[in-house]
Amino acid sequence: MQVYSFNLGMLSAMAKGEADYDAELAAVAATNLNVAASMNTGAMWPQGSSNEDHKTRALPEIWSTYPKVAESGKALADSSAALAAVAGDGLDALKGSIGDVGKSCKGCHDDFRAKKK
């Protein structure tokens, strides 16, 4: 999640005008995000484990509805692949694709992550 956040943070700052757009940096950050999002994370939630086994904000629903989690992960992998394909092609291309990544992140966070206390 930290790798996602680091790379998406750079891309979001560029898209919002909080940082200068840099085509090379945007392309690298989007590729990094896609590589991380494309990793098989299923082993992070093995059967028999729970959110009480580690310090985590993961909700129990990750274990009880794992196929839905996998769908959310695929949505992030797909949207980050689309972003990686265009992030270095200009600020407008970045802006046009980053929203789908944000929606993918939000969908998983809304369903599977506890709010900060």
What label would you give each PLM region?
Residues 1-23, 27-117:
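Sequence context surrounding c-type heme c attachment/ligation sites in exported
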